[in-house]
A protein has these predicted regions:
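Acidic, glycine-rich loop-and-beta core segments that form the ion-binding/anion-interacting portion
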Residues: 1-17
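Charged (often Lys/Glu-rich) extended helix/loop segments that serve as interaction or gating elements
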Residues: 16-158
Length: 158
């Protein structure tokens, strides 16, 4: 597919293309559950961050699809854009988002962040003592999929 697209370009000589399509192939393979430790207006302080499984959310600013885990409680229909801050107190432990979540999210709520891909677990560090080696395997539908058969759905992409 990449070669076919390159051949449609109107240039005399194609450059050598080197790519690693890993994210496109396995983005949907992983998600993580984070806990909200503190909320200050549109800032959520969570128990994971860029030194944990969410590196790509900070440095290249990938906006992970997110959903509140409701545990049966009523959630607001009003959605709000949030920034995330990780637990390390380091200025790099920040994820700009926007992460669109219900307006009534509060401390001790849980959020699923999807599309971690192959590198979520690989990039984890033990910086400032925050590290967990607990991994649980569950099966569920992805938070968001690029393979959705219903093309009438639209997603906010930042």
């Amino acid at each position: 597919e990449i070669k076919k697209s390159l051949n449609t370009l109107k240039i005399d000589k194609l450059p050598e293309i080197i790519c690693e399509p890993g994210r496109a192939l396995v983005a949907e393979s992983g998600s993580t559950i984070v806990r909200v430790n503190l909320r200050k207006k549109q800032k959520l302080y969570i128990n994971d961050g860029t030194y944990g499984t969410l590196f790509d959310g900070g440095v290249p600013n990938i906006v992970y699809p997110s959903r509140l885990i409701t545990n049966g409680r009523m959630i607001s229909k009003k959605m709000t854009a949030f920034d995330f801050y990780g637990p390390t107190c380091d200025s790099m432990d920040y994820m700009k988002g926007p992460f669109i979540l219900p307006n009534n999210i509060k401390e001790n709520d849980y959020i699923e962040l999807g599309q971690l891909g192959a590198y979520g677990l690989t990039f984890r560090t033990q910086f400032n003592g925050f590290y967990s080696d607990k991994i649980f395997e569950v099966e569920d539908e992805p938070v968001m999929t690029m393979y959705d058969k219903d093309k009438s759905k639209s997603y906010l992409v930042a």
